[in-house]
Amino acid sequence: MNTEGFPRDSETEMKHLTEMILKGDEEQAARSAEELSRERTEVNDLVDAISDAMNIVADLHEVDRYSVEQVERCEKAAERALTALRPKIRVEQTRISGRVMVASLKDDPHSFDKTLLMAMLEIGGFTPLDGGSDMSPQEIVQKVDELDPDILAVPLVTESAAKNLLETSHLISSNRIKPHIVAYGRGAASLSPQEGFGTVEEDSISALSRIAELLISKN
């Protein structure tokens, strides 16, 4: 409910959700997400709105408008909003077997896209493996050795992180365990599958679909 005591319409509430994430207000972000989802049977467009808000946060961080601490507060608010929406997130259920490790790299200001994909994998019937956040290429390879995944999914927000993924791919190419790498997110736009590391997808939803396809073909 707004300050005038009247309920907001959907468009206004959507803007409010974005504002609360940008302010890093966990309670208000969760409350806004709950309000928006109340009359809906599916909320994938709201998940997109949360992702868009975190892209704005990344932009503000890149131009030094947001500190690391502010980004962390925004990420926590986005995660609370995602938790509120989770019961109504709809993805295709699957019984496909396979090990999917999700990890984010250094030089990305946040790892919300990692959190989102892991949630969607769980909802879809997978058991995702947490490969860590803010990882160096060497740390990713160590995690690959430890967890032995079939697929390594890496969200990318910035081009700097994309460069780290290329280094990671190079290290993995000479490694004993060689998972198929799926890069996704706006930072992946600078990459090409022809560079030898696997697959490039636009967002978490398309990454999830590609992961399912890859595991089906493997099985």
Give the ranges of each region predicted by the language model.
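Long amphipathic alpha-helical segments
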Residues: 1-93
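Short, contiguous strand/loop micro-motifs
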Residues: 4, 20, 103-105, 127-128, ...
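CheY-like receiver
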Residues: 32, 143-147, 210-214
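Alpha-helix N-cap/loop-to-helix initiation residues
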Residues: 39, 67, 109-110, 161
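Short, flexible hinge/linker loops that cap or flank conserved catalytic cores
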Residues: 93-96, 175
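Glycine-rich active-site/cofactor-binding loop and its immediate structural neighborhood
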Residues: 95-131
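Cofactor-cradling patches in redox/metallo enzymes
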Residues: 120-122, 130-194
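Peripheral docking tails and interdomain loops at the edges
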Residues: 183-219
